[in-house]
Amino acid sequence: MQIKLANPRGFCAGVDRAIEIVNRALEVFGPPIYVRHEVVHNKFVVEDLRARGAIFVEELDQVPDDVIVIFSAHGVSQAVRTEAAGRGLKVFDATCPLVTKVHIEVARYSRDGRECILIGHAGHPEVEGTMGQYDASNGGAIYLVEDEKDVANLQVQNPERLAFVTQTTLSMDDTSRVIDALRSRFPAIGGPRKDDICYATQNRQDAVKQLADECDVVLVVGSPNSSNSNRLRELAERMATPAYLIDGAEDMQRSWFDGVERIGITAGASAPEVLVRGVIQQLHAWGATGADELAGREENITFSMPKELRVRSLL
């Protein structure tokens, strides 16, 4: 059995920044540091930060007064920001800048009196935060659609004053079909010049297509609640390549590789490389060889830290 590695894979710039914000806050201010929602969707990362003194909560009413709170990479609604400000909580915002870009678009559509359609997955924290940027007090509304069926059933107030945005971690192929359906049903709809799916999601989906084309089975390292990791598994399966989403080596079964010659490995944008190395080590113990990285797209994007943490870390 030969191992092939997707390129790129694993951490993106937004995840790197979010984790570093929590780490630096712990270093500068000491524990406990409260984090609203898992800072990124990866069990290994969350447990490591929890061991260092991070406390993960789902709502601000679980946060005591006079502590530091970090908003996760997925972003939060304006209502959450207002609640934090009203309580005087010290907040560091780890929202991915590419998610913030979508938030700004939604707020602009609201101010302009346009209704907004968000393409995304119900219940995902990024979706909840993005929908919470729309101020419906002026009579407008924001709608959530997941697929073409939702578009066909959608009723809006004014089809002539309508715009769309997308969750950043969706399948590019699925999203393209939904956008086509929106434009067909609502010809006057506006939107971004390209969809809001982030560079890292696009690059990892392109890479897994190449991997699935060259391998007999694909392993996606990522947690079950990671949207972008699930999309990678689905994409490989659509290419008729068996694919498994695993948190780490401990989730693998030896029988998956019976009769397999080429094993492909990729990782979602919130999965650290150490987990990939653990998978490779276990596969080597089962007789696999190599770990050749495919040619891919280089990523050199970085996002800046909050000023206070950036300055304090240099002291």
Curated annotation (Swiss-Prot):
<feature type="binding site">
    <location>
        <position position="198"/>
    </location>
    <ligand>
        <name>[4Fe-4S] cluster</name>
    </ligand>
</feature>
<dbReference type="GO" id="GO:0051745">
    <property type="term" value="F:4-hydroxy-3-methylbut-2-enyl diphosphate reductase activity"/>
</dbReference>
<feature type="binding site">
    <location>
        <position position="227"/>
    </location>
    <ligand>
        <name>isopentenyl diphosphate</name>
    </ligand>
</feature>
<feature type="binding site">
    <location>
        <position position="226"/>
    </location>
    <ligand>
        <name>(2E)-4-hydroxy-3-methylbut-2-enyl diphosphate</name>
    </ligand>
</feature>
<feature type="binding site">
    <location>
        <position position="124"/>
    </location>
    <ligand>
        <name>dimethylallyl diphosphate</name>
    </ligand>
</feature>
<comment type="similarity">
    <text>Belongs to the IspH family.</text>
</comment>
<feature type="binding site">
    <location>
        <position position="74"/>
    </location>
    <ligand>
        <name>dimethylallyl diphosphate</name>
    </ligand>
</feature>
<keyword id="KW-0004">4Fe-4S</keyword>
<feature type="binding site">
    <location>
        <position position="96"/>
    </location>
    <ligand>
        <name>[4Fe-4S] cluster</name>
    </ligand>
</feature>
<dbReference type="InterPro" id="IPR003451">
    <property type="entry name" value="LytB/IspH"/>
</dbReference>
<dbReference type="GO" id="GO:0016114">
    <property type="term" value="P:terpenoid biosynthetic process"/>
</dbReference>
<feature type="active site" description="Proton donor">
    <location>
        <position position="126"/>
    </location>
</feature>
<comment type="function">
    <text>Catalyzes the conversion of 1-hydroxy-2-methyl-2-(E)-butenyl 4-diphosphate (HMBPP) into a mixture of isopentenyl diphosphate (IPP) and dimethylallyl diphosphate (DMAPP). Acts in the terminal step of the DOXP/MEP pathway for isoprenoid precursor biosynthesis.</text>
</comment>
<feature type="binding site">
    <location>
        <position position="41"/>
    </location>
    <ligand>
        <name>isopentenyl diphosphate</name>
    </ligand>
</feature>
<feature type="binding site">
    <location>
        <position position="270"/>
    </location>
    <ligand>
        <name>dimethylallyl diphosphate</name>
    </ligand>
</feature>
<keyword id="KW-0411">Iron-sulfur</keyword>
<feature type="binding site">
    <location>
        <position position="270"/>
    </location>
    <ligand>
        <name>(2E)-4-hydroxy-3-methylbut-2-enyl diphosphate</name>
    </ligand>
</feature>
<dbReference type="GO" id="GO:0051539">
    <property type="term" value="F:4 iron, 4 sulfur cluster binding"/>
</dbReference>
<feature type="binding site">
    <location>
        <position position="228"/>
    </location>
    <ligand>
        <name>isopentenyl diphosphate</name>
    </ligand>
</feature>
<feature type="binding site">
    <location>
        <position position="74"/>
    </location>
    <ligand>
        <name>isopentenyl diphosphate</name>
    </ligand>
</feature>
<dbReference type="GO" id="GO:0046872">
    <property type="term" value="F:metal ion binding"/>
</dbReference>
<keyword id="KW-0560">Oxidoreductase</keyword>
<feature type="binding site">
    <location>
        <position position="41"/>
    </location>
    <ligand>
        <name>(2E)-4-hydroxy-3-methylbut-2-enyl diphosphate</name>
    </ligand>
</feature>
<comment type="pathway">
    <text>Isoprenoid biosynthesis; isopentenyl diphosphate biosynthesis via DXP pathway; isopentenyl diphosphate from 1-deoxy-D-xylulose 5-phosphate: step 6/6.</text>
</comment>
<feature type="binding site">
    <location>
        <position position="226"/>
    </location>
    <ligand>
        <name>isopentenyl diphosphate</name>
    </ligand>
</feature>
<feature type="binding site">
    <location>
        <position position="124"/>
    </location>
    <ligand>
        <name>(2E)-4-hydroxy-3-methylbut-2-enyl diphosphate</name>
    </ligand>
</feature>
<feature type="binding site">
    <location>
        <position position="228"/>
    </location>
    <ligand>
        <name>(2E)-4-hydroxy-3-methylbut-2-enyl diphosphate</name>
    </ligand>
</feature>
<feature type="binding site">
    <location>
        <position position="168"/>
    </location>
    <ligand>
        <name>(2E)-4-hydroxy-3-methylbut-2-enyl diphosphate</name>
    </ligand>
</feature>
<protein>
    <recommendedName>
        <fullName>4-hydroxy-3-methylbut-2-enyl diphosphate reductase</fullName>
        <ecNumber>1.17.7.4</ecNumber>
    </recommendedName>
</protein>
<comment type="pathway">
    <text>Isoprenoid biosynthesis; dimethylallyl diphosphate biosynthesis; dimethylallyl diphosphate from (2E)-4-hydroxy-3-methylbutenyl diphosphate: step 1/1.</text>
</comment>
<feature type="binding site">
    <location>
        <position position="124"/>
    </location>
    <ligand>
        <name>isopentenyl diphosphate</name>
    </ligand>
</feature>
<keyword id="KW-0479">Metal-binding</keyword>
<feature type="binding site">
    <location>
        <position position="227"/>
    </location>
    <ligand>
        <name>(2E)-4-hydroxy-3-methylbut-2-enyl diphosphate</name>
    </ligand>
</feature>
<feature type="binding site">
    <location>
        <position position="228"/>
    </location>
    <ligand>
        <name>dimethylallyl diphosphate</name>
    </ligand>
</feature>
<feature type="binding site">
    <location>
        <position position="74"/>
    </location>
    <ligand>
        <name>(2E)-4-hydroxy-3-methylbut-2-enyl diphosphate</name>
    </ligand>
</feature>
<dbReference type="GO" id="GO:0019288">
    <property type="term" value="P:isopentenyl diphosphate biosynthetic process, methylerythritol 4-phosphate pathway"/>
</dbReference>
<feature type="binding site">
    <location>
        <position position="270"/>
    </location>
    <ligand>
        <name>isopentenyl diphosphate</name>
    </ligand>
</feature>
<feature type="binding site">
    <location>
        <position position="226"/>
    </location>
    <ligand>
        <name>dimethylallyl diphosphate</name>
    </ligand>
</feature>
<feature type="binding site">
    <location>
        <position position="227"/>
    </location>
    <ligand>
        <name>dimethylallyl diphosphate</name>
    </ligand>
</feature>
<feature type="binding site">
    <location>
        <position position="12"/>
    </location>
    <ligand>
        <name>[4Fe-4S] cluster</name>
    </ligand>
</feature>
<keyword id="KW-0408">Iron</keyword>
<dbReference type="GO" id="GO:0050992">
    <property type="term" value="P:dimethylallyl diphosphate biosynthetic process"/>
</dbReference>
